[in-house]
């Protein structure tokens, strides 16, 4: 086995030169193979059963599904009106009317086609793109030898479900149908679940502990592991994974040994959501998948931004700008919305940058403007400071030398506030502008959290808001916040100083990797996505100086997915470059600009 020096590990690649002039990633690919008997043997019979089920569902005529959905919706409506007529209802619930109508409206288009479901979906341009291009579901082509379920069976199932919906709440039956469809599509394609999570992410504010989100991620991981075991997906194990697993292990230890069951549950949730890095880093294997991921985030941001703008207009007309605390839209707090919009604005700017079609550029420019307006109405003015830092980070990546160091300095520059001497801090506290911006309040929170960290240096105080509040009560009675308000400080307080070192190692590898690797692939389209993910990471690090960016579990998951996307796109860009160099058989062509090919 090859031995690597510490600087090679931190740099992210070895110094060995390949015959085509490319550098070699320090990574290992893992996939299903004949020598992995425990995986392939276990999944062999299950895979055959699932493939048979997939074949039946795919080749069942669309008319069967239309009959099932239409009969279920229409008959449910009739049965509930009968219940209203005989006096079981004062009035038919609005929820019943909506659910029944939705199923009827969905079912009617399916009644118009006799083609198998998979073929019918491929025949329509919109559904073909959504299911088979965007969500990467495997295409099933027409096969007359395959027989599905007849329409008569669909009608019978629709009647049975409608009767069941009259006995139990209809929304429960509808939810079970939706959940089964979601599970099937998830196990059919892990990309479906992975991308759909981003679309629903803004609407998970009810899931304050992140448990529901963790369940969705766990299902995606199981589907992805199944594909890896069958040899249909690849897992990339790199030095980032080592640092991530160390950090997650510290979170687990803190969750188990420090503050009981609640802390343990929170740690398990954080571990599962941290696997967003693994999913993004391994599922994204080409530019199309990278664009799908970024588009999923952008798509989900548009309705949220519109809601935030409307909410702000209503609130400002009522209380005025001076008393307006900021829009939160579907999120629980304005600063959480600001984090999400920082990511979506950056990705929409990326598409404005790389798209050549003028109409598409205008569309993404409009989305950028809408998101930017919504970001302003969060009243999180530190977010605009981070946008300036992001612009500097983007420019730094164009430097031929020293860009990694500049990225690191931009990330930690704001933390120099922690080094201000105590007497000077007192002067800063007295400044009216500083008080208005809340900086003095933040510094006081940091000082209290530092005392707590000093006494819980290695194991931390436990995971979650409850653990933090329980421990901080031993140091002050005048603390009305659920965290320290600083990203790195809060990570250290909750999971111990080793978790901070592990995260620092991950980040150091990224900026070193990005700084040295950028000139090698600087004109690759996929590399541009990686550049923007680096910009986002730097911005979130800076934004985290005065906000704990992982307080909301959706943003914690989003952070690791964006970070994983950066790793994946670097790897893909490197592979594309090496393949082009090998194709042109010109080992002297060190600059990719002379032979760059736009991969679509």
How should each PLM-predicted stretch be described?
Residues 95-103, 194, 200-252:
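Hydrophobic alpha-helical transmembrane segments in multi-pass integral membrane proteins
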Residues 95-110, 403-410, 530-591, 600:
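Transmembrane alpha-helices of multi-pass inner-membrane enzymes
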Residues 62-69, 186-197, 233-246, 292-297, ...:
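Membrane-interfacial loop-to-transmembrane alpha-helix junctions, especially the N-terminal start
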């Amino acid at each position: 086995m090859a031995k690597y020096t510490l600087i090679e590990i931190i740099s992210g690649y070895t110094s060995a030169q390949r015959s085509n002039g490319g550098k070699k990633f320090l990574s290992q690919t893992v996939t299903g193979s004949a020598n992995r008997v425990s995986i392939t043997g276990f999944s062999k019979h299950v895979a055959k059963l699932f493939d048979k089920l997939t074949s039946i569902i795919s080749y069942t005529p669309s008319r069967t599904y239309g009959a099932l959905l239409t009969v279920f919706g229409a008959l449910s409506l009739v049965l509930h009106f009968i219940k209203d007529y005989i006096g079981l209802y004062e009035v038919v619930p609005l929820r019943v009317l909506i659910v029944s109508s939705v199923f009827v409206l969905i079912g009617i288009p399916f009644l118009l086609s006799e083609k198998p479901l998979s073929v019918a979906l491929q025949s329509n341009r919109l559904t073909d793109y959504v299911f088979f291009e965007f969500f990467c579901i495997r295409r099933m082509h027409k096969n007359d030898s395959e027989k599905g379920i007849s329409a008569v069976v669909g009608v019978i199932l629709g009647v049975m479900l409608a009767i069941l919906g009259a006995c139990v709440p209809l929304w429960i039956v509808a939810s079970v149908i939706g959940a089964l469809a979601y599970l099937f599509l998830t196990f059919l394609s892990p990309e479906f679940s992975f991308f759909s999570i981003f679309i629903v992410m803004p609407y998970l504010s009810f899931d304050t502990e992140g448990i529901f989100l963790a369940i969705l991620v766990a299902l995606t991981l199981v589907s992805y592991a199944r594909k890896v075991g069958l040899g249909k997906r690849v897992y990339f194990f790199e030095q980032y994974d080592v640092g991530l697993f160390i950090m997650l292990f510290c979170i687990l230890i803190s969750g188990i040994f420090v503050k009981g069951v609640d802390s343990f549950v929170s740690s398990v949730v954080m571990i599962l959501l941290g696997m967003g890095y693994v999913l993004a880093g391994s599922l994204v294997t080409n530019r199309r998948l990278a664009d799908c991921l970024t588009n999923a985030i952008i798509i989900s941001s548009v309705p949220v931004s519109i809601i935030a703008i409307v909410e702000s207009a209503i609130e400002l007309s009522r209380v005025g700008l001076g008393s307006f605390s900021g829009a939160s839209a579907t999120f629980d707090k304005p600063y959480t919305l600001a984090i999400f919009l920082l990511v979506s604005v950056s990705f929409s700017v990326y598409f404005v940058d790389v798209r050549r079609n003028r109409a598409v550029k205008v569309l993404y420019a409009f989305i950028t403007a809408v998101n930017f307006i919504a970001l302003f109405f969060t009243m999180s003015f530190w977010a605009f400071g981070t946008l300036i830092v992001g612009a500097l980070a983007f420019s730094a990546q164009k430097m031929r030398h020293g860009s990694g160091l500049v990225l690191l300095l931009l990330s930690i520059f704001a933390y120099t506030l922690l080094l201000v001497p105590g007497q000077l801090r007192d002067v800063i506290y007295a400044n009216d502008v500083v008080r208005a911006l809340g900086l003095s309040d933040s510094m006081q929170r940091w000082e209290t959290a530092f005392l707590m960290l000093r006494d819980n240096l290695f194991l931390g105080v436990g995971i979650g808001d409850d653990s933090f509040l329980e421990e901080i009560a031993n140091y002050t009675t005048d603390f009305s916040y659920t965290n320290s308000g600083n990203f790195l400080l809060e990570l250290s307080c909750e999971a111990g100083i080793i978790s901070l070192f592990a995260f620092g190692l991950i980040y150091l590898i990224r900026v070193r990797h990005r700084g040295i690797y950028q000139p090698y692939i600087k004109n690759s389209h996929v590399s541009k996505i990686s550049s923007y993910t680096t910009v986002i990471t730097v911005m979130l690090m800076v934004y985290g100086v005065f906000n704990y960016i992982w307080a909301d579990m959706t943003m914690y998951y989003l952070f690791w997915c964006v970070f994983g996307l950066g790793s994946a796109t670097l790897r893909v860009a490197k592979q594309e470059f090496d393949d082009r160099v090998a194709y042109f058989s010109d080992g002297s062509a060190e600059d990719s600009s002379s032979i760059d090919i736009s991969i679509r």
